[in-house]
Amino acid sequence: MAARINTSLHNALSFLKPFNTPLNTKPFSFRRNSFRFSKKLPYYSQFSSGKRALYCTSSSQESTVDEGETFVLTTPLYYVNAPPHMGSAYTTIAADSIARFQRLLGKKVIFITGTDEHGEKIATSAAANGRNPPEHCDLISQSYRTLWKDLDIAYDKFIRTTDPKHEAIVKEFYARVFANGDIYRADYEGLYCVNCEEYKDEKELLENNCCPVHQMPCVARKEDNYFFALSKYQKPLEDILAQNPRFVQPSYRLNEVQSWIKSGLRDFSISRALVDWGIPVPDDDKQTIYVWFDALLGYISALTEDNKQQNLETAVSFGWPASLHLIGKDILRFHAVYWPAMLMSAGLELPKMVFGHGFLTKDGMKMGKSLGNTLEPFELVQKFGPDAVRYFFLREVEFGNDGDYSEDRFIKIVNAHLANTIGNLLNRTLGLLKKNCESTLVVDSTVAAEGVPLKDTVEKLVEKARTNYENLSLSSACEAVLEIGNAGNTYMDQRAPWFLFKQGGVSAEEAAKDLVIILEVMRVIAVALSPVAPCLSLRIYSQLGYTEDQFNSITWSDTKWGGLKGGQVMEQASPVFARIELNPEKEEDEKKPKVGKKTGKAKVKVVEQTPTVAEA
């Protein structure tokens, strides 16, 4: 994959390191699962009312999380049959914002992502591109790392299922499940979807035995395979979901999972006799382990350290169980049904939550190369920069639901919110401060805001943003931060400090305080928006006179009013977000995209947002 694509100078900065400064504040209340599955007891008997439930809550009551508890967050391990697409980028952007928020709360975060590199589809894709499987996996896996860097994804662990340490964990896990009597050998005949790498029930297929996910006909196969006794875990899984309804989120995804289980669980094949590219089944090198039985264990193998012993006991000691599996809804069954049953069989704790988000469409249509309407993440971030891409998808898509992208909507949103509401407010205020106060704050922001209702408004909106971040309501969190910006703009317009400065005397003194208040609003915005748009937040912080090291040490407590101090010198005003402008001669085409045809292109242009005539 080519080297990292250069992004807009104003919308992209160097890759931000995660910040890990402790914070004395209420931690995110993902409650620790207090039970461990033992092979000595019936599985369904281990859920007593005396045990704490495995679920997430965002109530204001004291959390049951132990001090210093690790927050482990995972994306799926992405399949390397093809380069990353926008759906994968969306999942990872969301995960990164959650991880950054948890770090702001002072949590030790382990953010895991990686690539799933075994299976028939990988071998086929490699051959089609004239490569052997290892070469193909190296190339595509690196493309994911490159995209994550471009999007300012601050992951902690990147696991590849071709890593030797992963294979060691998979084989030990397989041996545990086998020893528990949950693996047996049998012949299987059925309809197989190569793209899903899964046998399908006829009742779930479309006309002509087409897979409902890939719209391609399934093929008839007969194999001698090893099977996992999933049916044995129907009652335990029903009990888990009944006692811990927040185990699967959003709630309508829980309903889907309960429906699958209620319809009856069937044992599933966990090996392939016709696939060479995979981890060999222990004691039977003629078969390889099914890609999903393999890949799910990447969430555990990622926890191991290269210089430590590679076994399950060591791996789980570094942070298992996961606090949150963040996935697309298309792989919900694997994570909410197969994976918990596998963990129970191996005597390991379950993850605390599985969150299945929706799909993305473009201009209201499903994306596809045949339609000529694919959305390429590399091109998008090259064109608009990471802040715009991150903000749009987290702000515009209600997390959990399906969402739609259109370039026209994208440009309108990021220009209105980031360039105008946030960027222009900062630019105007710093301009007035330079002209009238030599870029120096006259008093502490706490003193300036005495008796000013705006301070209370901002504090309420900060709490609203925090609650929404905790609830994984990322769109609502963005909206709360934007409301802070709107409140700051309203205050600026109502107070009209440019007019007060012209009055002189006490009026000018009040105007100088007004500028301190507005800049404190901007400082709070920079902290509260940093999980979503870290580079933009850094640029705001820098113009307020802070260093990058100071920004990297912020915590959520820095959203508390009172950070700016009298005598603090601000930097020269310059646009913190490049306004996106349509190419004028192509504007009409841009507003009316035609499927399968290239339309006019938008461009990023820095627009100096000068003060109004009255302000000047």
From Swiss-Prot:
Protein location: Plastid, Chloroplast; Mitochondrion
Result of knocking out the encoding gene: Lethal. In heterozygous plants, aborted ovules.
Q: Which GO terms describe its molecular function?
A: ATP binding; methionine-tRNA ligase activity
Where is the sequence biased in composition, kind Basic and acidic residues? 582-593
NCBIfam families documented for this protein: metG, PRK12267.1
Q: Which family does it belong to?
A: Belongs to the class-I aminoacyl-tRNA synthetase family.
Q: Which PANTHER family match?
A: METHIONINE--TRNA LIGASE, MITOCHONDRIAL, METHIONYL-TRNA SYNTHETASE
Name assigned to this protein? Methionine--tRNA ligase, chloroplastic/mitochondrial
Species: Arabidopsis thaliana (Mouse-ear cress)
